[in-house]
């Protein structure tokens, strides 16, 4: 079995969870005996059995792949769409259905809506995103699969190690508006709640990053930059709790890492969080709003939060995740 991977946008333009997923899948699938390669757009002689798109391809591409004998699978992030209110999603479905009837087929192909009926398999990290795909785009119900992200076994072991607790909360996320880093920093200042931010911007001269740095005072709000390996693990193990006020997420790996460290969670009261972690006893939720509205909830969370001796919720290794993808590959190849 040979699988070709395609990721858009490319990693040099946007780092994040989908890069981590792609790299982990290619590595772990190879360990399970699957031949993997990146899709070589310049190589007209490249061969394979499956094309795995990380992100939505256009229908014309899927049809061309089928004509060449490939099966096609997509892993899609619908976090933003799935976090919209039901009224907006209802209106979007109505407009989408109207456009399907009114617009010519070639135009619809460019929008990518028809791809949900033509893919051999679709994978989502969380259930509510798959439900959104079926609701909005009439995705074929029998072709959907829910496979969460994972972590390295070494990371699970290292994050679970005991460490002397310190008095701070931690937020680990890229520094850009979707993550609401500035909002959280200002709320922490109002609450007098010490917090450490880990992460990097998409550009050092980005205006949002510059605004964020103005909130850093080195006392209540600290910024440790991008952290990896033991440096990241140390910050997580020493924290009282983990906070993330994103507008949307899709199986956020930072949340998984915080859970592996046994940290209680304070997350946005939006579907990406409350529908996924709503049954987790150590998870709390706060609605988005101005800093003065968030500050009291942040202060209460800080006062009550303490690291647990075990993971906040069950987690998989990347090898286990890859094994689930391999089951899907075999299914669409007819049990090969």
State what each model feature region is.
Residues 134-135, 142-166:
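Acidic anion/phosphate-binding donor-loop and adjacent secondary structure
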Residues 97-122, 131:
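Membrane-proximal helix-turn-helix segments that form the acceptor-binding/catalytic region
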Residues 17, 303-334:
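A charged, aromatic-enriched C-terminal amphipathic alpha-helix characteristic of glycosyltransferases
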Residues 19, 194-221, 231, 235:
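Short, structured helix-loop element that forms part of the nucleotide-activated donor/catalytic region
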Residues 247-248:
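Aromatic "clamp/platform" in nucleotide-sugar-dependent glycosyltransferases that forms part
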Residues 162-179, 185-192, 196-198:
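Conserved donor-binding/catalytic core segment of Leloir-type glycosyltransferases
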Residues 264-267, 274:
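Short hydrophobic beta-strand element within catalytic cores of glycosyltransferases
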Residues 283-291, 299-303:
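Conserved acidic donor-binding segment of nucleotide-sugar-dependent glycosyltransferases
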């Amino acid at each position: 079995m040979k699988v070709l991977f395609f990721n858009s946008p490319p990693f040099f333009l946007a780092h994040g969870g989908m890069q981590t997923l792609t790299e982990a899948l290619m590595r772990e699938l190879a360990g399970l005996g699957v031949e993997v390669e990146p899709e070589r757009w310049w190589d007209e002689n490249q061969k394979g059995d499956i094309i795995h798109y990380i992100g939505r391809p256009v229908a014309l591409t899927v049809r061309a792949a089928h004509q060449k004998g490939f099966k096609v699978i997509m892993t899609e992030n619908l976090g933003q769409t799935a976090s919209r209110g039901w009224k907006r999603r209802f209106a979007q479905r109505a407009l989408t259905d109207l456009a399907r009837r009114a617009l010519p087929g070639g135009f619809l192909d460019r929008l990518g809506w028809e791809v949900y009926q033509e893919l051999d398999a679709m994978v989502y990290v969380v259930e509510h995103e798959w439900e959104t795909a079926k609701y909005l785009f009439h995705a074929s119900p029998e072709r959907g699969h829910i496979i969460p992200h994972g972590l390295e076994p070494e990371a699970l072991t290292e994050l679970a190690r005991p460490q002397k607790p310190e008095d701070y909360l931690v937020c680990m996320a890229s520094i850009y508006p979707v993550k609401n880093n500035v909002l959280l920093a200002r709320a922490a200042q109002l609450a007098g709640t010490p917090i450490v931010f880990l992460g990097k911007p998409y550009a050092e001269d980005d205006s949002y990053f510059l605004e964020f740095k103005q909130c850093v005072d080195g006392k209540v709000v600290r910024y440790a930059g991008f952290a990896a390996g033991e440096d990241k693990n140390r910050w997580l193990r020493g924290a009282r709790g983990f906070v993330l006020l994103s507008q949307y997420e899709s199986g956020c790996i930072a949340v998984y890492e915080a859970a592996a460290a046994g940290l209680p969670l304070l997350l946005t009261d939006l579907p990406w969080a409350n529908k996924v972690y709503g049954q987790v006893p150590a998870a709390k939720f706060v609605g988005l709003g101005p800093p003065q509205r968030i500050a009291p909830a942040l202060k209460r969370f800080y006062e009550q939060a303490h690291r647990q001796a075990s993971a906040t919720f069950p987690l998989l290794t990347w090898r286990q995740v890859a094994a689930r993808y391999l089951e899907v590959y075999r299914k669409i190849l007819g049990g090969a």
